[in-house]
Amino acid sequence: TVITSISLDHMEYLGGTVTQIAGEKAGILKKNMPVVYDDTDAAASAVIRNRAAELSCPAYPISPEVYTDLRRGHGGMSLMIKEKSQRLFIPFEAEYQAVNACIAYQAARLLAVDGETAAAGIRNAVWHGRMEEIQDGVYLDGAHNEGGIRAFVGAAAEVAARRREESGKDGRIFLLFAAVSDKNYESMLETLMRKLKPDRLVLTHLYTSRALSMEAMEKAAHRVADGCEVQSIPDVKTAYQTLVQEKRPEDTCFCVGSLYLIGELEKKISRTGFDSTARMV
């Protein structure tokens, strides 16, 4: 059994607190079967750990404590798993993927996959829409709830800082944002503005019945803008093209807020590889 990070999402089905959601997730544990889980949230971990004990499940908690020597660079990062003395290369720039990779590695080893084969699988992994660079300095990220946005801003700030250092110029940060109406979009926007401090925010509208109205999004964005330029462009394709065309080489552009947004962009972007340029179709 594998359980990744738990945050407040799908609360209408799973419950209104992290512990309630963890209890629902722990429902997949099976008696005497091992469980590998994200151990970074104490409240969630306690629920999973207790359920594992009740069912006599061998438990493998994974947190940043299990690895050392984290090295970051353009296109990914590497780390050393302490207990296994195994170095992993992770082809994603967001640091939260380090724990995810270690979870995957531990699960593979429990399935009798040898260490080198497991490491090769992680090294060759592809994950569209998670801090995915689709052309130079343009990233898609599917963060769509408060926990996801908190993880996103840390990773995005590091990416933007690295690009500024590499270019030797004070590059700007652009955001393309959209959300669905049943998420805490006000908190998401506040975190983005306060932590990432973008120079420009473009709001767009999703083609789904769950989409947040432009009016509600604009009101929330202007409330927390704090000097950031805010623009509304309802058409996703036009909004994307506007930001990318105005982006200078040293600037960084992030598209975030909803998996619906990432899905719409994925349909409209043609790419031939990770480091290729993308064009709208």
Model-derived features: where do they sit?
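Nucleotide phosphate-binding/pyrophosphate-handling subdomain across enzymes
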Residues: 2, 6-7, 20, 84-200
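Acidic, Mg2+-coordinating active-site environments of NTP-dependent enzymes
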Residues: 3-88, 101-116
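Short coil/turn segments at beta-strand junctions that form active-site/ligand-binding loops
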Residues: 33, 169-173, 228, 249-252
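C-terminal helical cap/extension that packs against the catalytic core
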Residues: 41-56, 60, 189-252
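Active-site-proximal loop/hinge segments that shape catalytic or ion-binding/gating pockets
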Residues: 258
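Short, flexible loop segments at boundaries between secondary-structure elements
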Residues: 206-210, 275-281
